[in-house]
């Protein structure tokens, strides 16, 4: 039987992270330069504010959203920041290299930083399914592989289906969810009694998770509209996302009370479901013609998320063998699928309204994009999960899953624990 003492990453982590950072610095030195044009100076402030919103979402929102576990709050916040910082650097280079052929100098603009931040956000969402089951070295590998897979997916879909940046990135809800769930399926499963103890929600960390949900709730309209070019589409995206999020909050609190035998409200259900509307309208937020439709989507999404939070973890554990403590499948994959279906319906409606007879062709294209995104997510997630199972990463023992003591120094604890 293997030892349950924590496996030290003292040599592995610094060597891996610092070598990778040195390589990134060299790549930036030889292959990047800043945009010297003056064309976008008028919109510089507005563009920077959108990028700032995305950074707040990533660093504070997703960082604190996953910090509700009693014994895994430090790692959730700090590891998310680490993945964000690394993912943005790699995404800027990768997007620049993939967007030009033959490869040349990568021009860094505020838009490219926004695009890279959204790519890094995908890793933070996927990591919600595996945080606590992997160490920081494994997360480094996951960041590199997922950002590369997402960038490749965007390039392939753009070249085959001629889609814009927004549509490419909005497929990422499904991509990140299925990528994260597939990686979690490949990892060693936690011990049942240990998992029950470690997954307990503490009061103070749960408040921190709700704080993260509030930051995400405030800035999600910026995320859904970040890559849209047309001012009218950006305005529609912001409005529709706000309406959907507002209804999600009402549905989350009401549904949480309904799901409890005594009518009590669960903080876990609330901070899972308040964002449901933003996810559901993400793909089609710029096409929704009226507020009531966005509000209906927010209502349906909130109910799906509450149902997933109540029944999902047990179902995923029993049927799929996935320790989905963050309800990844219900909060992102099902809601992302709902958003994709609504997008297809709106595209068909727009095609009929304009008198274009190619309805079947439009549906076929949309289904092709959706299927390709899921296929790439499952394939890359499976390869990543198998890669993370290699012993060279010194993964934590299953008895030490979701435990900050494995990674952090606690002055009041004995040496070696």
From Swiss-Prot:
Family statement: Belongs to the ammonium transporter (TC 2.A.49) family. Rh subfamily.
Annotated transmembrane regions: 12-32, 44-64, 77-97, 125-145, 172-192, 203-223, 238-258, 265-285, 287-307, 331-351, 358-378
Membrane topology according to the record: Multi-pass membrane protein
SUPFAM superfamilies hit by this protein: Ammonium transporter
GO CC annotation terms, alphabetical: plasma membrane
Key words, A-Z: Membrane, Transmembrane, Transmembrane helix
Naturally occurring in which organism (per UniProt): Pan troglodytes (Chimpanzee)
Stated name of the protein: RH-like protein IIF
Listed InterPro entries: Ammonium/urea_transptr, NH4_transpt_AmtB-like_dom, RhesusRHD
Major location category of this protein: membrane
Function, in words: May be part of an oligomeric complex which is likely to have a transport or channel function in the erythrocyte membrane.
């Amino acid at each position: 039987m293997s030892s349950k003492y924590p496996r030290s990453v003292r040599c592995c982590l610094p060597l891996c992270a610092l070598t990778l950072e040195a390589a990134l610095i060299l790549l930036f030195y030889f292959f990047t330069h800043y945009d010297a044009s003056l064309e976008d100076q008028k919109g510089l402030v507005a563009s920077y504010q959108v990028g700032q919103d995305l950074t707040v979402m990533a660093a504070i929102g997703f960082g604190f959203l996953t910090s509700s576990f009693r014994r895994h709050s430090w790692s959730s916040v700090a590891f998310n920041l680490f993945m964000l910082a690394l993912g943005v650097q790699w995404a800027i280079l990768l997007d620049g290299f993939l967007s030009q052929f033959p490869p040349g100098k990568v021009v860094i603009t505020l838009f490219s930083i926004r695009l890279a931040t959204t790519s890094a956000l995908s890793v933070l969402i996927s990591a919600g399914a595996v945080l606590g089951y992997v160490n920081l070295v494994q997360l480094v590998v996951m960041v590199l592989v997922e950002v590369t897979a997402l960038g490749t997916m965007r390039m392939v879909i753009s070249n085959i289906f001629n889609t814009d940046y927004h549509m490419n990135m909005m497929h990422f809800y499904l991509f990140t969810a299925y990528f994260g769930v597939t990686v979690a399926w490949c990892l060693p499963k936690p011990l049942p009694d240990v998992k029950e103890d470690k997954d307990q929600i503490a009061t103070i960390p749960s408040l921190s998770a709700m704080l993260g949900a509030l930051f995400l709730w405030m800035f999600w309209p910026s995320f859904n509209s970040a890559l849209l070019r047309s001012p009218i589409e950006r305005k529609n995206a912001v409005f529709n996302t706000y309406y959907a999020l507002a209804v999600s909050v009402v549905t989350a609190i009401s549904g949480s009370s309904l799901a409890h035998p005594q009518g009590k409200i669960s903080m876990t259900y609330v901070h899972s479901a308040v964002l449901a509307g933003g996810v559901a309208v993400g793909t089609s937020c710029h096409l929704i013609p009226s507020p009531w439709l966005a509000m209906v989507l927010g209502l349906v999404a909130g109910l799906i998320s509450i149902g997933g939070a109540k029944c999902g973890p047990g179902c995923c554990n029993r049927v799929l063998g996935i320790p989905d403590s963050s309800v990844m499948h219900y909060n992102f994959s099902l809601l992302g699928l709902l958003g994709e279906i609504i997008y297809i319906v709106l595209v068909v409606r727009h095609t009929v309204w304009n008198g274009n007879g190619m309805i079947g062709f439009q549906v076929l294209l949309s289904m092709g994009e959706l299927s390709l995104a899921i296929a790439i997510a499952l394939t890359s997630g499976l390869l990543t999960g198998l890669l993370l199972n290699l012993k060279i990463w010194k993964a934590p023992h299953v008895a030490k899953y979701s435990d900050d003591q494995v990674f952090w120094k606690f002055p009041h604890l004995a040496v070696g624990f």
